[in-house]
């Protein structure tokens, strides 16, 4: 939208998991008066259509994985065009000494589990002072286990489904491998197949070994 407001035409490669949402947003913009050809949406496999988009654009804005970001940067550099990249991360939240632990837990819930944790800005690590750790864990566990997990169109639930089978297997794999290395499950750590094929319980791991990939690699 900012690109359109600045007077640019936009070609957008829609994520295959949210393609209808992107298309609807574009159609509503046209309905509101945006000229038909100013905002174009491209659908398809990124490996097939990605180069066609990046090799013909005047500027590239990419959100995705770090390996793909390197490819985009290389192709943009060869053409001497500008680009911006929002790539993988492992966002931490630090609870400071003297913090209000109830408030900190509330912030952690929204930051970690908004959109079922499927946001680039979601936190994936929590650092808590040793003297407050036990109390904070108890508060966090209580709050998480009171969350309503499910799916409805009435916004009656606090957390919903993951987007795909591939995503739930990725999440489960990270958790299972961490537990195998010695991490402890404070809460969650399991699929909720009774709710649907892609539901996974909101999960917190403690005592995660420094060697565990869940501590260093982005889960989403």
Q: Which residue ranges define each predicted feature?
A:
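ALDH superfamily catalytic-core signature
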Residues: 33, 57-59, 67-213, 218
């Amino acid at each position: 939208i900012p690109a359109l407001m600045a007077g640019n035409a936009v070609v957008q490669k829609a994520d295959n998991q949210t393609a209808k949402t992107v298309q609807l947003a574009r159609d509503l913009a046209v309905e509101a008066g945006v000229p038909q050809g100013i905002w174009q949406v491209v659908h398809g496999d990124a490996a097939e259509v990605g180069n066609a988009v990046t090799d013909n654009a005047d500027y590239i804005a990419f959100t995705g994985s770090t390996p793909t970001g390197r490819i985009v940067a290389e192709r943009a550099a060869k053409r001497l065009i500008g680009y911006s990249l929002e790539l993988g991360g492992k966002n931490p939240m630090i609870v400071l000494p003297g913090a209000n632990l109830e408030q900190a837990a509330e912030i952690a819930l929204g930051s970690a589990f908004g959109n079922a944790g499927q946001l680039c800005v979601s936190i994936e690590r929590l650092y808590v002072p040793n003297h407050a750790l036990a109390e904070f864990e108890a508060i966090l566990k209580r709050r998480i286990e009171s969350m309503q997990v499910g799916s409805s169109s009435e916004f009656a639930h606090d957390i919903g489904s993951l987007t795909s089978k591939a995503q739930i297997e990725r999440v489960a794999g990270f958790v299972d491998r961490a537990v195998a290395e010695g991490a402890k499950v404070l809460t969650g750590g399991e699929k909720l197949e009774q709710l649907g094929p892609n539901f996974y319980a909101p999960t917190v791991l403690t005592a995660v070994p420094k060697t565990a990939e869940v501590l260093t690699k982005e889960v989403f």
